[in-house]
């Protein structure tokens, strides 16, 4: 049993990139689907596909690598808010990720979005993870 599904999601992506895998399969949930959509919109992954099976479904993610250096597009995935220590932030108090080069994924009352989107909509929330 996984006690922190978001940490498991990030770890599966991190481990697949360290092993230079092109594809990673992750058990699906609505929150993970939204995080995957954000990663695709921001250009951190090549493509993704949701597959339904008899249980909860799968998310298949095609990871993105630099063509010349073969380095992954995602340099770091770190969990910020965790079950034992939740981290919340107001819209004007979001910390910049990698001096503005990365993104933070935030769960707000208006849905899951990046820190920049939350700041523009003037809504705070739980900071799930930082990606750069």
Task: Label each PLM-derived region with a short phrase.
Residues 1-132:
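Core subunits and conserved enzymes of cellular information-processing
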């Amino acid at each position: 049993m996984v006690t922190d599904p978001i940490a498991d999601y990030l770890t599966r992506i991190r481990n697949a990139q360290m092993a230079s895998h092109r594809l990673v399969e992750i058990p699906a949930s609505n929150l993970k689907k939204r995080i995957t959509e954000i990663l695709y919109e921001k250009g951190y992954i090549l493509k993704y596909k949701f597959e339904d099976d008899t249980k909860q479904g799968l998310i298949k993610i095609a990871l993105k690598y630099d063509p010349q250096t073969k380095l992954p597009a995602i340099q770091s995935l770190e969990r910020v808010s965790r079950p034992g220590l939740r981290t919340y932030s107001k819209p004007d108090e979001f910390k910049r990720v990698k001096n503005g080069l990365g993104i933070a994924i935030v769960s707000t009352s208006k849905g899951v979005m990046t820190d920049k989107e939350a700041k523009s909509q003037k809504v705070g929330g739980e900071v799930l993870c930082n990606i750069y």
